Amino acid sequence: MVYHSSFVDEEGVTKACGCPLLPLKSHIKGPAPVSEQDKTDIVDEAITFFRANVFFTNFDIKSPADKLLIYLTFYINVALKRLEGCRTLAVGTKAIINLGLEDIPVPGETGFPFPGLFSLPQSQDEAELFRNYLKQVREETSGRLLSVAYRANGTPNKWWLAFAKRKFMNVVVL
């Protein structure tokens, strides 16, 4: 069974490219509203549901937040692929930082992993807003992913890194 986002009806949430810019429990500067620390945010959901959702090739979208959940599941898959050969937390952190420095394409640009999932930006401002939100949510996801992909002593958690070999929705990760 595919796990869906609990952010079904988010009234008053700004949208860009058909995706809600959901609040994040984040200290990283960006366009996302700040969520309360004790509440679950979309990054928590993506990490929690990743190991179950990564096995599915089809994902029935029930709310706009599911689109973001799909994107984050794919991003976690990419990040785990980068962490696959990293034997220590320090090396893994460096790999994740390098991943964060890569360009972030938005719908309509080459390299965007899910054409058709998100609507095309109606203006350059909307494209930049969405790009900045994706950058912020990716950085937040990366930080939290490192805390589960590596144990407290800095060694890899093989239970998590084993999922780097999976293809999510039959999308090949390079």
Swiss-Prot record:
Family stated for the protein in its record: Belongs to the ARPC3 family.
Keyword terms, alphabetized: Actin-binding, Cell projection, Cytoplasm, Cytoskeleton
TM helices/strands, residue ranges: none
Signal peptide: none
Protein name: Actin-related protein 2/3 complex subunit 3
Distribution of this protein across tissues and organs: Expressed at low levels in all tissues with a relatively highest expression in inflorescences.
Pfam families: P21-Arc
Keyword Magnesium among record annotations: no
Gene name linked to the record: ARPC3
Broad class of where this protein is predominantly found: cytoplasm
GO cellular component, one term: cell projection
Subunit details: Component of the Arp2/3 complex composed of ARP2, ARP3, ARPC1/p41-ARC, ARPC2/p34-ARC, ARPC3/p21-ARC, ARPC4/p20-ARC and ARPC5/p16-ARC. Interacts with SCAR2/DIS3 (WAVE complex).
Known function: Functions as a component of the Arp2/3 complex which is involved in regulation of actin polymerization and together with an activating nucleation-promoting factor (NPF) mediates the formation of branched actin networks. Arp2/3 complex plays a critical role in the control of cell morphogenesis via the modulation of cell polarity development.
Organism for this UniProt entry: Arabidopsis thaliana (Mouse-ear cress)
Gene Ontology molecular function: actin binding
Single GO biological process annotation from the record: actin filament organization
Keyword Transferase carried by entry: no
Gene3D superfamilies: Actin-related protein 2/3 complex subunit 3
Subcellular compartments: Cytoplasm, Cytoskeleton; Cell projection
